[in-house]
Amino acid sequence: MTRANHASGTDRLAEVVEQRGWKEDAIVVNVQGDEPLMPVANIQRVAAMLNETAGADMATLMEPLDPADANQQSVVKVVASETGRALYFSRSAIPFRREGGVPALLFRHIGLYAYRAGFLSTFVGWPPAAAEQSESLEQLRALAHDAYIQIELAPEAVPAGIDTESDLAAVRALLGAEQ
């Protein structure tokens, strides 16, 4: 078990890596607990992305976001560069559309990360960033310290995550239907 007072799931994962004594170059994948239906192909892809991308400290995935969900704070949005480098994550609709309305192309961040074990040691040495605390998004600590987060479209759609009571009910219903 891990300590109960970690600032984030990434901090908790770093404790596990330290306890297990994993090598610095080991690739560690963290599937967020609120994404219980994560497709195996996505888990495999995020690990492969980190392995294939020179200089990347982390890798993660995104998927197109229904504009109707743009203003839901429980849905994390992401903006990425043309080369697949994550630029910012937010609970607000980003990028902002100056003309009003919802941006035409939005992406939802998927709660799945791959790290090199050595990077996790570096990450926990950084204090939480102001943006991380404001948005309650741990990946913003990495960006605040110029970490390179590689991101691409998920190979498979991610079924409903669990961010609200209604999400939990939907996942329970789905799992009950599969039994």
Residue spans for each PLM region:
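Structural signal for conserved beta-strand scaffold positions within catalytic alpha/beta enzyme cores
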Residues: M1-R3, N30, T60-L61, Y88, ...
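Short phosphate-binding loop-to-helix
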Residues: M1-V31, E35-A48
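A short acidic, often aromatic-flanked loop/helix-cap motif at beta-alpha or helix-coil junctions
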Residues: N5-T10, D66-P67, A157-A160
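Short beta-strand-to-turn element immediately C-terminal to the catalytic PLP-Schiff-base lysine
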Residues: V16-Q19, V79-S81, I162-D163
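Short, high-confidence coil segments that cap the C-terminus of an alpha-helix
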Residues: E24-D25, T53-A56, A147
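Conserved core of the sugar-phosphate nucleotidyltransferase
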Residues: M38-A129
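Conserved alpha/beta core of the MobA/IspD/sugar-nucleotide pyrophosphorylase nucleotidyltransferase superfamily
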Residues: P103-Q179
